[in-house]
Amino acid sequence: MEKLSFEEGKFAVKFARINIECYLSGVHYVVDDLPPIFKKPRGVFTTLYTYPKRNLRGCIGIPEPVMPLIDALKEASISASVDDPRFPPVGRMELRDITIEISILTPPKLVEANSPADYLEKIKVGRDGLIIEYGTYRGLLLPQVPIEHNWDIGEYLANLCLKAGLPVDTWIKKKVNIYSFESQIFKELSPNGKIVEEK
């Protein structure tokens, strides 16, 4: 799948910040001159962190490529700031103390597994984001999450189950579907500051 250039990634982060600022101020934000890739369907997540402590402040996204990237980014950035049920809505002044991280996702693919041991072989920590599905339960973790928490593959899968509201060993004991995806990550180093691509 086509990757974003660094300039396109910077555009995504800047767009997310301005979009959130406008939403919190009651102003409608419209962009006329879009890079072509933003008109293509892509999955995307917006993650907000406090600065400088880098505590999670909100994270919501659209994992499937069901709408143009610009629309997914618009929806995910606003939702991360006001709709994450784990946190109160971000205040307009608070945004000055928040950094923004954008993850552009590849389409999720089913990890083919005949036994739970296959997951340990096929999933790579740091490369793969994961989605687990079991009945009506569903959970997602971005590829950067196990790196930030220093999890091994077993801990990653256990926490994926927890994210879905399932017991930690569900991936071993039940017939689950696990999907993997990769992401391209662009983030601010400080609020409204320098933007880098995480490699």
Curated annotation (Swiss-Prot):
A Pfam family per the record: AMMECR1
Domain AMMECR1 span(s) in chain numbering: 7-197
Signal peptide span: none
InterPro entries in the record: AMMECR1 (IPR023473), AMMECR1_dom_sf (IPR036071), AMMECR1_domain (IPR002733), AMMECR1_N (IPR027485), AmmeMemoSam_A (IPR027623), Uncharacterised_MJ0810 (IPR023472)
Lineage: superkingdom: Archaea
PROSITE patterns the UniProt entry points to: AMMECR1
Name by which UniProt lists this protein: Protein Maeo_0138
Record lineage: Archaea, Methanobacteriati, Methanobacteriota, Methanomada group, Methanococci
